[in-house]
Amino acid sequence: MSNKIIGLGSIEIANDKPFVLFGGMNVLESRDLAMKIAETYAEVTQKLGIPYVFKASFDKANRSSVNSYRGPGMEEGLKIFEEIKSTFNLPLITDVHEVHQCAPVAEVVDIIQLPAFLARQTDLVVAMAKTDAIINVKKPQFLAPHEMRHIITKFNEAGNDKIILCERGSSFGYNNLVVDMLGMDEMKQSGYPVIFDATHALQRPGGRSDSAGGRRAQATELARSGMALGLAGLFIEAHPDPDNAKCDGPCALPLHQLEAYLTQMKAVDDLVKSFDAIDTSK
């Protein structure tokens, strides 16, 4: 098995390369907050020498309640993304939920994300593939790791092989997720880059009746465990005031802890990737 390298400007995304950080905020709450968070991430990752892609959503279409905040929408969201990209010279990733969003979003961002709940929607997969953008596929909570090959095949047959696979936890009874570390290793056998969404793996879906709960206190332990697998990247969201974030605050890393947090993740990644491979199957 060879590791596929996805090129993004000067960034190389691959399981055997230094990890890439996909991070930012869950949903765009305001232009000013997005700029503040992007600036913090850019400064910290530049200081630590970590390749970085800014992430935020313009619409959270799958909230628990119809009254929950969803975001500014695509038109306003893309304006904010363009300003972040030009101001900080950052590549961008965001998610799409409908076929008509794919082409205009791909004109602004570098990576478009297929949400976990929509990962089997063929029309959406084909529309995303046709943009020729890099695709980040969130593994559905209800799929086994080996079933990701079907989604990969759909993208390939639609003409796109610039694929990243993202683990975000698996359903474990009601209102709970667990992370199968061996499952991430199984996805790595595809050769495609695998990244770990340590933020949403902390969720307790529906745990607060009308919104998801989370286990922010375990953010460090979970991410360190994932990084020990030798992954292509880490997906982490942060907020200056997680308790008052408009979406997934219980899972968000406090923004002021970002540098200390990433320092540990980089140390784990550097150490693991310095080891020689051991084939224990023989």
From Swiss-Prot:
Organism: Shewanella sediminis (strain HAW-EB3)
Domain of life: Bacteria
Signal peptide: none
Gene3D superfamilies in UniProt: Aldolase class I
UniProt name for this protein: 2-dehydro-3-deoxyphosphooctonate aldolase
Alphabetical keyword list: Cytoplasm, Lipopolysaccharide biosynthesis, Transferase
Localization of this protein: Cytoplasm
A GO biological process held by the record: keto-3-deoxy-D-manno-octulosonic acid biosynthetic process
A single GO molecular function term of this UniProt record: 3-deoxy-8-phosphooctulonate synthase activity
Catalytic activity: D-arabinose 5-phosphate + phosphoenolpyruvate + H2O = 3-deoxy-alpha-D-manno-2-octulosonate-8-phosphate + phosphate
InterPro entries attached to this UniProt entry: Aldolase_TIM (IPR013785), DAHP1/KDSA (IPR006218), KDO8P_synthase (IPR006269)
Biological pathway: Carbohydrate biosynthesis; 3-deoxy-D-manno-octulosonate biosynthesis; 3-deoxy-D-manno-octulosonate from D-ribulose 5-phosphate: step 2/3; Bacterial outer membrane biogenesis; lipopolysaccharide biosynthesis
GO cellular component, as recorded: cytoplasm
HAMAP family for the chain: KDO8P_synth (MF_00056)
Enzyme Commission number(s): 2.5.1.55
Family in the record: Belongs to the KdsA family.
Principal cellular location given in the protein's record: cytoplasm
